[in-house]
A protein has these predicted regions:
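GHKL-family ATPase ATP-binding module
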Residues: 1-281
Length: 282
């Protein structure tokens, strides 16, 4: 039923917080900027407009929009000197978390590139930012390590006896944003900052691993750059860890009270629980 002749559509919601519940309502404007920017990232082509009243009747307006969603966001993060060009992949899968659970559909979208200057991984589900990741993060870790390790082994990039790469070696040069939508969602807890869907994790792992393997075959130059940078990250991390352990060992030896101090010997007593120490000035 038509009740008016306005051309614009939509819903306007105005609300005031209950001060008995929300005792502190001084929310910084940066919080709203962050929320709107994230929503613009995962809702491609939708403009989010923030109007902030800085004085009576005076407003500052900001707009947030990414025409191509997470793909444009990746390009913004990577800049002009990334190791590889950003890529965007998407797929749909159907499945269930357990045999006794209902089947549901999930839509997967991933945009990524590699860089030796910027590193960031963000995960979204049903337009919500997953601060603690959960299933998408686990899938990314598994798929990335599996696909890149396979490329390194197949192309003899490891030196003899060298340990396998780990996800931190990849993460140090990875810019990745994933956005998924599903008709069934299991959250880790009430804060809803991580999802635990087993099927989403399995579907995304298989999807991302297969796309990466194809990408490495079709983009040899990019694959070589990725492999080289991941190995640099790995070997740098291992060198730093060895240095840290050696330094810790040296410092521990200097302060180890169990070591005998020069010109001091254990006192002699039949009671093994007693010791005597003389502290002499100088």
């Amino acid at each position: 039923e038509q009740t008016g002749n306005k051309k614009r559509t939509g819903t306007t919601i105005r609300w005031l917080p209950d001060l008995d519940v929300f005792t502190d309502i001084d929310i910084p404007v940066d919080y709203y900027r962050d929320v709107m920017r994230r929503q613009a990232v995962v809702n491609a082509g939708v403009t989010f407009r923030l109007k902030n009243e800085t004085a009576a009747g005076k407003f500052e307006t900001e707009e947030f929009v990414y025409e191509h969603g997470i793909e444009d966001y990746i390009r913004e993060l990577a800049g002009l000197d990334a190791l590889t060009e950003p890529v965007y992949w998407e797929a749909e899968r159907r499945g269930r978390d357990r045999p006794d659970k209902p089947e549901y559909k999930v839509k997967l979208s991933v945009a990524l590139c590699f860089s030796n200057k910027t590193a960031l991984c963000e995960y979204y589900h049903n337009s919500s930012f997953l601060e603690h990741g959960g299933s998408p993060e686990k899938a990314t870790r598994s798929a990335m390590v599996s696909a890149i390790d396979k490329y390194l082994r197949d192309n003899n990039k490891y030196v003899k006896g060298e340990a396998k790469i780990t996800f931190p070696d990849v993460q140090d040069c990875l810019i990745l944003v994933s956005s998924s939508f599903s008709t069934q969602t299991s959250y880790e807890n009430q804060t809803k900052k991580a999802i635990t869907n087993k099927f989403i994790q399995e579907a995304m792992t298989e999807f991302l691993r297969s796309r990466l393997e194809i990408y490495f075959i079709e983009n040899r130059d990019a694959a070589e750059k990725i492999a080289a940078q991941v190995l640099i990250n790995k070997r740098s991390r291992e060198t730093a860890e060895r240095t840290r352990i050696n330094q810790k060992k040296k410092l521990t030896e200097k302060i180890d009270i169990a070591n005998r101090v020069q010109k001091f010997v254990d006192c002699r007593t039949k009671d093994v629980e007693r010791r005597e120490i003389y502290i002499v000035e100088g």
